[in-house]
Amino acid sequence: MLKKKSILIFTIIFFLNTPSLLANEKLKIIENINNIKTLKFNFVQISFDKKENGICFLKRPHFLKCIYEDKNKKELIVNRRNLVIYHKRYNKTYYYPVSKSYFIDILDKKKFENLILDGNLSLNEEIFKIKYSTENKGEIIFFFNKENFNLSGWEIIDLNGNHTSFKIDNLNKNQNLNNKLFSIPEIN
């Protein structure tokens, strides 16, 4: 009988403390994110059943460039308020509103912090997941390494129900990145 009471008390204490434990983990993630000025990483992206990979460079608060290893030599560039897909092979540039994407939220430390604080945190054996959704952008799930709190990827479900998975590997923090790297190519 005493053993059952002990287990019951432990279970109650554990579940009462779980929200504060998760809040503490969110703060550790935010602290890690706020210490990042630049990132360089390899990625694997899966969208529309197509797997793509490449390398990305991120410089806060305004810049992101992902270079895809594909035949079109595609580049995704976020440069302040512009979101551009550039096909180097064809010298074609396509502009999109960055306001309808989560990139602006990831690049801005305060906005990213708010996504983390307002999102629902869950964990498994290896990663923390933070799920956040909004009416005008859809849903995003961020993945963070459980050991070092590094961003390890995200999954987006857009307003049309399309899934995009983005996995990060070989993450390097706070390297010098020249702003020229994020220039939008001029069309000839």
Predicted regions mapped to residue ranges:
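A short, Trp-centered hydrophobic/proline-enriched beta-strand micro-motif
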Residues: 31-51
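Flexible, surface-exposed loop/linker segments and immediately adjacent secondary-structure boundaries
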Residues: 89-127
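Short hydrophobic/aromatic-rich beta-strand segments that constitute the beta-sheet cores
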Residues: 43, 64-68, 83-86, 130, ...
